[in-house]
């Protein structure tokens, strides 16, 4: 698998270098939107040696190859659903640590009164358990 990845990366790195030596750079226009691939041939003044069909075929093959390549390397990446141990911290709380100073309640203090209930009972309104 490492050989295939290295070979594909080498091809993708060498391809622009080889293509730039054989052709002149095209003129750029501000109105070119590369998200609309059907407008790519009309963005440049210089006509290409390849027809539009070849251009679309090359783009389609590159999209297909990159999709296959991405699906091939996805199981080896620790992202998304594959990231089982992405967070290397325990899911359970840490064990209790003994504090340096224990809080001790005074011995002779009376208990604080219980808080008043937030609801009024029916029996409190009627006068008891009659």
Curated annotation (Swiss-Prot):
It comes from the Viruses. It is found in: Host membrane. GO terms for biological process: regulation of signal transduction. Keywords: Early protein, Glycoprotein, Host membrane, Membrane, Phosphoprotein, Signal, Transmembrane, Transmembrane helix. It comes from Human adenovirus C serotype 6 (HAdV-6). Belongs to the adenoviridae E3_14 family. Its main location: host cell. Down-regulates the EGF receptor and prevents cytolysis by TNF. The chain crosses the membrane at residues 53-77. Phosphorylated on serine; O-glycosylated, but not N-glycosylated. This is Early E3B 14.5 kDa protein. Residues 1-19 form the signal peptide. GO terms for cellular component: host cell membrane; membrane. It is a single-pass membrane protein. The lineage of its organism: Viruses, Varidnaviria, Bamfordvirae, Preplasmiviricota, Tectiliviricetes. Pfam families: Adeno_E3_14_5.
């Amino acid at each position: 698998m490492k050989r295939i990845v290295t070979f594909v990366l080498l091809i993708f790195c060498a391809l622009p270098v080889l293509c730039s030596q054989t052709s002149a750079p095209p003129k750029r226009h501000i109105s070119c939107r590369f998200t609309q691939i059907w407008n790519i041939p009309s963005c440049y003044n210089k006509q290409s040696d390849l027809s539009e069909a070849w251009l679309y075929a090359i783009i389609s093959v590159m999209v297909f190859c990159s999709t296959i390549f991405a699906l091939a390397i996805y199981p080896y990446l620790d992202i998304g659903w594959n990231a089982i141990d992405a967070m290397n911290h325990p899911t359970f709380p840490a064990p209790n640590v003994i504090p340096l100073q224990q809080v001790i309640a005074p011995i002779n203090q009376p208990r604080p009164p219980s808080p008043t209930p937030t609801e009024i009972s029916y029996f409190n309104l009627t006068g008891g358990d009659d």
